[in-house]
Amino acid sequence: MTPKPEGHVASYLERRKFLATLGGAVAWPLAARAQQPAMPVIGVLDSVSVDFGIRNLPAFRQSLGEEGYVEGQNVAIEYRWAEGRYDRLPELAAYLVRRRVSVIVANSTPASLAAKAATSTIPIVFGVGDDPVKLGLVASLGRPGGNATGVNFFVGELAAKRLGLLRELVPSAARVAVLVNPSDPVRTASNLGDVEAAARAIGLQIQVLKASTIGEIDTAFATLARERADALFVTPDSFFNSRRVQLAILTARHTFPAAFGQRDFVEVGGLMSYGTNLADARRQIGAYTGRILKGVKPADLPVVQSSTFELVINLATVRALGLTAPPNFLARADEVIE
């Protein structure tokens, strides 16, 4: 029997109605998903190499998690590493601004200055070893104003302490070489001023050595070997952090007692370090980042003055250099690496 035309039309219309209903059922969750707020993005801007920078990321992620933000679940993080090349920082900061990240975490003085120059609206949480007021990052420590706040590491006060500890290990030292990175003139001037003042106070002469490339580090050590200073003071610097293995090898090869700012150098064979506990500083930065993601303004968060410092000494290196670590020195150490 030939079906009636009207029955065919009715069947066709029913199929259309079913498909329309199905299409609406599929489209509804897609539309609802599109209406959900976008996942916030944190932009991490760092001067160091990846292998150095990732060492303290667990502390940052932990405190961020305590504020309710878990990477990959309800927050995304984009990492940009300058690998010790400060000239790359402006473009890396500009990328994060173009990416429209929710907040920029800047983990060094050069990175913080690059971030501040790139935006006056995106919140910035910094970690710096210099006075953030003098750097122009904030109006004051208690009332930052603007779009930036963070953690200050007290580098100036640490220089005198670090130099004094080096003198305890090498009491016969009369002249100390100071290694600085000229590609960061602001930090170099600050570091040199602090070390010169500390050296005068304890009767030490200093010799300045400059290096901003791998080759220049080798050249600096050749000069050091030729002129034979009694010890070496390596100023805190992101490029030097990235070259910590090279520096530890060279100090061992030339038998130079050397003082560093971070424990990472001592873990790869350096003699001693005294400085900020970077993991603790990253925890503080993570906490501030989480609060800003919740809507707190950087201007309302006072700059945190880092107060957790650590002395680390490598006893194997002490012996290899023919030195003796006094018992009271070892007693003050937060960690002794055998």
PLM features: residue spans?
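Short hydrophobic alpha-helices and adjacent helix-cap/hinge residues
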Residues: 1-338
